[in-house]
From Swiss-Prot:
This is Hexaprenyl pyrophosphate synthase, mitochondrial. It comes from Saccharomyces cerevisiae (strain ATCC 204508 / S288c). It is a peripheral membrane protein. Binds 2 Mg(2+) ions per subunit. GO terms for biological process: isoprenoid biosynthetic process; ubiquinone biosynthetic process. It holds the Pfam family polyprenyl_synt. An all-trans-polyprenyl diphosphate binds at R202, K323, T324, Q361, K378. SUPFAM superfamilies: Terpenoid synthases. Belongs to the FPP/GGPP synthase family. Pathway: Cofactor biosynthesis; ubiquinone biosynthesis. It is found in: Mitochondrion inner membrane. It is an enzyme of class 2 (transferase).
């Protein structure tokens, strides 16, 4: 009994000492944290680029300004609410991370010494374009905008405030403009998508088409793309112009791929026009199709169930790249190009954006099954109702061949949507999609570590990459 009491007293004494030590250590940490201010709030990557993000919407509205008040209202509609703004955030954080690469390794683009502070490191004659600001215009303004003294409604966008390069922040003027361009292109795609998908809500309020009619939403999206391409051209970099212009084409290609769920489904041979289904006009020119296409059943192709699933996933991933990952990956590549980085770093930045973009869409497809429309900011379960088979459905189809006919007819018959949802839950389609998303997340993290030196900006990118898997909207 005495020994037990002694042991208990000994344990209590050790525990007391440990508590005092723990308490002392906590006090020391708290005191140290007051002396050393952390450079980044790890749970808030926006803090590193808050200056640029805070003026993003304002600068975009200035870039897209029109002399027509209704056009201004519609094009600026989606910029009035707080969206995720993931794409410009990625470009800005990546630009800061790239600035940590020594200048001696960023010698693949010339720098304009007249645009930077007096500093020997920026005054090399062989580097005279890197810090150059985007041009305000290339062609004469009266040609670009048709300005006439007697017609004050025809005018170009408002001039942007002059931004001087901040060596401590490391984001170049052209990279900042790139972030704004990316958000313009993405927002244009949202305007068009909401028309195509007959959406009623976006970001918790009426969608552009619901608020202004389909016609206004389409025209506003077109206008945004036009303004974006003008801004792209003013970056004066042929590869950047090519990449960003191509990303716009990719968005459209992805939307057309979404008309079918697999590459072996029958081609769409009608066009919906209101309540009529019109035949597609006969082809006058033969256009070469992409390599991802495979012969259809109508051409006598015989595939096993596993082969059908494999081709369906290949089709889905390629469609996902075009619709979501192309804009992200190509903007990341452009940020690296504008930084003067080496070809190896540029390639890694592109792969980072591609893997992150596919991960982002996989999570989006999961949320369509798991999150309410109110939390998501757009209608939940929309994909199935639109006849679209996403990754959770494809995983369920692998285990449940009876889903094949439902997918082929785009879930158009009574009970198809409900049966598919039940099958997804029964066969763990959501959990399997999460595992696939984690694989792409891990690849994206590796791309960052292989291409960028350790820095607060890289840590913020890693945090952002990990947070994609836990987002709820």
């Amino acid at each position: 009994m005495f020994q037990r009491s002694g042991a208990a007293h000994h344990i209590k004494l050790i525990s007391s000492r440990r508590c005092r030590f723990k308490s002392s250590f906590a006090v020391a940490l708290n005191a140290a944290s007051k002396l050393v201010t952390p450079k980044i709030l790890w749970n808030n990557p926006i803090s590193l680029v808050s200056k640029e993000m805070n003026t993003l919407a304002k600068n975009i509205v200035a870039l897209i300004g029109s002399g027509h008040p209704v056009l201004n209202k519609v094009t600026s509609y989606y910029f009035e609410t707080e969206g995720k703004k993931v794409r410009p955030l990625l470009v800005l954080l990546l630009s800061r991370a790239l600035s940590e690469i020594p200048m001696t390794e960023r010698n693949h683009l010339k720098i304009d010494k007249s645009d930077v502070p007096e500093d020997p490191i920026y005054s090399k004659p062989s580097q005279n374009q890197l810090f150059q600001r985007p041009a305000s215009s290339i062609s004469p303004l009266h040609i670009l905008h048709g300005i006439k003294p007697l017609n004050p409604l025809t005018k170009g966008p408002e001039p942007l405030p002059e931004e001087t390069f901040d060596k401590q922040r490391g984001i170049l003027p052209k990279q900042r403009r790139l972030a704004e361009i990316v958000e313009m292109i993405h927002t244009a795609s949202l305007l068009h998508d909401d028309v195509i998908d007959h959406s009623d809500t976006r970001r918790g309020r009426p969608s552009g088409n619901a608020a202004f009619t389909n016609k206004m939403a389409v025209l506003a999206g077109d206008f945004l793309l036009g303004r974006a391409t003008v801004s792209i051209s003013r970056l004066h970099n042929p590869e950047v112009v090519e990449l960003m212009s191509n990303s716009i084409a990719n968005l459209v290609e992805g939307e057309f791929m979404q008309l079918k769920n697999t590459s072996i489904d029958a081609d769409i041979d009608t066009i919906e026009n209101g309540h009529k289904l019109l035949p597609v006009p006969s082809k006058k020119l033969e256009v070469k199709e992409h390599d991802f296409r495979v012969p259809s059943r109508q051409q006598g192709l015989q595939l096993s169930h596993d082969q059908i699933i494999e081709t369906a996933f290949e089709y889905y991933i390629h469609k996902t790249y075009l619709k979501t990952a192309a804009l992200i990956s190509k903007s990341c590549r452009c940020a690296a190009i504008l930084s003067g980085a080496s070809p190896a770093v540029i390639d890694e930045c592109y792969d980072f954006g591609r893997n992150l973009g596919i991960c982002f869409q996989l999570v989006d497809d999961m949320l369509d099954f798991t999150v309410s429309g109110k939390d998501l900011g757009k209608p939940s379960g929309a994909d199935l109702k639109l006849g679209i088979a996403t990754a959770p459905v494809l995983f369920a189809w692998k285990e449940d061949p009876s889903l094949g006919p439902l997918i082929s007819r785009n879930f158009s018959e009574r009970g198809d949507v409900e049966k598919t949802i039940d099958s997804v839950r029964l066969h763990n389609g959501i959990a399997k999609t999460k595992i696939l998303a984690e694989e792409y997340r891990d690849k994206a993290l590796q791309n960052l570590r292989d291409s960028l030196p350790e820095s607060d900006a890289r840590s913020a990118l890693e945090f952002l990459t990990n947070s994609i898997l836990t987002r709820r909207k």
